[in-house]
Amino acid sequence: MVGVGGGDVEDVTPRPGGCQISGRGARGCNGIPGAAAWEAALPRRRPRRHPSVNPRSRAAGSPRTRGRRTKERPSGSRLGDHGRGRALPGGRVGGRGRGRAPERVGGRGRGRGTAAPRAAPAARGSRPGPAGTMAAGSITTLPALPEDGGSGAFPPGHFKDPKRLYCKNGGFFLRIHPDGRVDGVREKSDPHIKLQLQAEERGVVSIKGVCANRYLAMKEDGRLLASKCVTDECFFFERLESNNYNTYRSRKYTSWYVALKRTGQYKLGSKTGPGQKAILFLPMSAKS
């Protein structure tokens, strides 16, 4: 109420005795006549809801934040389609998995461990030959021949162990006879297939029959013969091919190769060439 002098006057309207006014209505007035009607006349306050509980505000959002992100994706979070996990920095990328492996990439797995590195392929070893142990891929690295070119006995310690040259074409071993003939034979017990390879220079070798005491030579007409003395026709370029077979090409007649036919006879040098099976040989140990 407002007083005559403009000052405020306290409201002294009588209320039922024993009533206490609270923020949500009168308490203790249920037993007083007329208290119910008086309480109904009081203004009621509706309880306020927290903004986070209001479903409309949660669905629609405020105009200021609608249509934009309020938080940036943390660094190292997972990238990809419907992923739910957040991997550590350097985490996996792509897929729908929920794994948290820090290093795994791709896939849909849910593993939590780092993938084990794939084992390196085993080194290619020597393949066993049909007639014994094979020195596949070996290149002769031997000292040079004596300057006098003598055909005497080999000085001890100057040569590697004797070899057998196994031809891929027909499965023959290169054989040098004491009378100078050259051919192939399948029996590995034949003593004339035991050969001594000696390096004259890098990549160049001579081939000598241990029992025949003769050197393999390529003649000008392409024939293979065994010479008692070392000449310029007795040296061959030794090359390791990609299939682990060796080829022996004449140093004097550079387009001709040592070769054996499927019948076991030697092949004329003029009829040989790269890629033929007849020119492929495997050096095998003669001790077995």
Swiss-Prot record:
Region of interest: Disordered: 1-156
Crosslink feature (Glycyl lysine isopeptide (Lys-Gly) (interchain with G-Cter in SUMO1)) location: 228
Residue positions where Omega-N-methylarginine is found in the record: 108, 110, 112
Gene3D superfamilies per record: 2.80.10.50
Signal peptide positions (record): none
Subunit composition and interactions: Monomer. Homodimer. Interacts with FGFR1, FGFR2, FGFR3 and FGFR4. Affinity between fibroblast growth factors (FGFs) and their receptors is increased by heparan sulfate glycosaminoglycans that function as coreceptors. Interacts with CSPG4, FGFBP1 and TEC. Found in a complex with FGFBP1, FGF1 and FGF2. Interacts with FGFBP3. Interacts with integrin ITGAV:ITGB3; the interaction is required for FGF2 signaling. Interacts with SNORC (via the extracellular domain). Interacts with glypican GPC3.
Additional facts recorded: This protein binds heparin more strongly than does aFGF.
PANTHER family with a match to the protein in the record: FIBROBLAST GROWTH FACTOR (PTHR11486)
Name by which UniProt lists this protein: Fibroblast growth factor 2
Organism encoding this protein: Pan troglodytes (Chimpanzee)
Lineage, top ranks: Eukaryota, Metazoa, Chordata, Craniata, Vertebrata
Gene name linked to the record: FGF2
